[in-house]
């Protein structure tokens, strides 16, 4: 839809991802307070969320690089590699489990981290889809993933490529991100 940079090199994709992550962090903070988590466990939840973002993004790019082997014929991680949701979910989830139980064992009293783990899963079940929804809207604005070309009423114009004459070529496609 609009894959161009707006300001400071940021695109709408970057802005939507940032809004999604901030919204998920704020929701996690609100839910930990409402559920009565101790201050030390709240800090651990924030560290878990940060580790999920960092490790999740790294694994999302890594998983996409494996998918790209079929297209490029070699394993390459560069600016065009992209990211996959499932790679981020697996890596981010693994990072959260490790940090939550390791830090919980060392910094929480009375085994609170283990007792509150079901609550932590509930919080994650709310925050992950929230961040993902904003991310999918960002993906829609980037025009990186879409369905087939269509003439249906629900099709939207998306940037496809720039031809040899330097003109942008747009196609009406199925907006898969809006259906997820």
Provide a role label for each language-model segment.
Residues 1-179:
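Hydrophobic, membrane-interfacing alpha helices
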């Amino acid at each position: 839809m609009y894959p161009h940079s707006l300001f400071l090199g940021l695109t709408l994709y970057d802005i939507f991802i940032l809004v999604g992550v901030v919204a998920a962090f704020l929701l996690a903070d609100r839910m930990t307070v409402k559920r009565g988590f101790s201050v030390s466990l709240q800090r651990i939840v924030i560290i878990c969320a940060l580790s999920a973002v960092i490790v999740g993004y790294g694994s999302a790019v890594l998983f996409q690089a494996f998918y790209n082997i079929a297209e490029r014929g070699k394993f390459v991680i560069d600016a065009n590699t992209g990211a996959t949701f499932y790679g981020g979910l697996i890596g981010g989830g693994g990072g959260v489990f490790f940090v939550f139980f390791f830090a919980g064992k060392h910094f929480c009293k009375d085994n609170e981290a283990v007792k509150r783990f079901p609550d932590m899963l509930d919080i994650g079940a709310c925050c992950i889809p929230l961040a993902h929804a904003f991310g999918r809207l960002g993906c829609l604005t980037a025009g990186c993933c879409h369905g087939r070309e269509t003439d249906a009423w629900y099709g939207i114009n998306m940037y496809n490529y720039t031809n040899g004459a330097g003109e942008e070529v747009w196609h009406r496609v199925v907006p898969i991100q809006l259906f997820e």
